[in-house]
UniProtKB/Swiss-Prot annotation:
The basal body constitutes a major portion of the flagellar organelle and consists of four rings (L,P,S, and M) mounted on a central rod. One of its GO terms (cellular component) is bacterial-type flagellum basal body, distal rod, L ring. Belongs to the FlgH family. This is Flagellar L-ring protein.
Length: 232
């Protein structure tokens, strides 16, 4: 008796886990890894007895006299101006039609067809038609605006800067996350240390949230399971 109950319990547990696995869709973040970077300390300079030092380590407090202070090293920051506006539309239509008509008659009905047509002249008409009309359309638009300050986490060999950043905003019982990563050309950085997101290569922009409001927008696992099985 107890053995059968335990067996039934195990089967029910496996069924529930299998339903959850079939209906659950994993969420993979666009921006993976750390969203900040710390400056890398340089080696201690070696005094060679000369006034001019041909090679000096990275000096984060160095300020060029005839050049704007722009990010150039790991740990430097710059501001990304989010100006994303994407729209797309698509439409298609198809028409097809086909008509057919056939007419034939018998002056003398064959003997084996007299039971069907009689002895008089018989005329047979046949006609058919087929028609199909189909239309489809899709429209999509996306607008994202704002600012986000990011950190340089990698300096590429060609001088471009790979940047990452994250902003968290807590509102009531929910938290909004804005994450960004991409490759910035230092020539596109303005004097105010900003660069538009439209000039960032390999941009990854992610805007997600958690809390009860976000959970209310998600479909339950059981409902998602039946939605996956439904043929409609």
């Amino acid at each position: 008796m107890h053995k059968n109950a335990a067996h039934t319990y195990v089967i029910a547990s496996l069924l529930v886990f299998s339903l959850t696995g079939c209906a659950w869709i994993p969420s993979t973040p666009l921006v993976q890894g750390a969203t900040t970077a710390q400056p890398v300390p340089g080696p201690t300079p070696v005094a060679n007895g000369s006034i001019f030092q041909s090679a000096q380590p990275i000096n984060y407090g160095y300020q060029p006299l005839f050049e704007d202070r722009r990010p150039r090293n790991i740990g430097d920051t710059l501001t990304i101006v989010l100006q994303e506006n994407v729209s797309a539309s698509k439409s298609s239509s198809a028409n097809a039609s086909r008509d057919g008509k056939t007419n034939f008659g018998f002056d003398t009905v064959p003997r084996y067809l007299q039971g069907l047509f009689g002895n008089a002249r018989a005329d047979v008409d046949a006609s058919g038609g087929n028609s199909f009309n189909g239309k489809g359309g899709a429209n999509a638009s996306n607008t994202f605006s704002g600012t986000l300050t990011v950190t340089v986490d990698q300096v590429l060999v060609n001088g471009n800067l790979h940047v990452v950043g994250e902003k968290q905003i807590a509102i009531n019982q929910g938290t909004e996350f804005i994450r960004f990563s991409g490759v910035v050309n230092p020539r596109t950085i303005s004097g105010s240390n900003t660069v538009p997101s439209t000039q960032v290569a390999d941009a990854r922009i992610e805007y997600v949230g958690n809390g009860y409001i976000n959970e209310a927008q998600n479909m339950g696992w059981l409902q998602r399971f039946f939605l996956n099985l439904s043929p409609m």
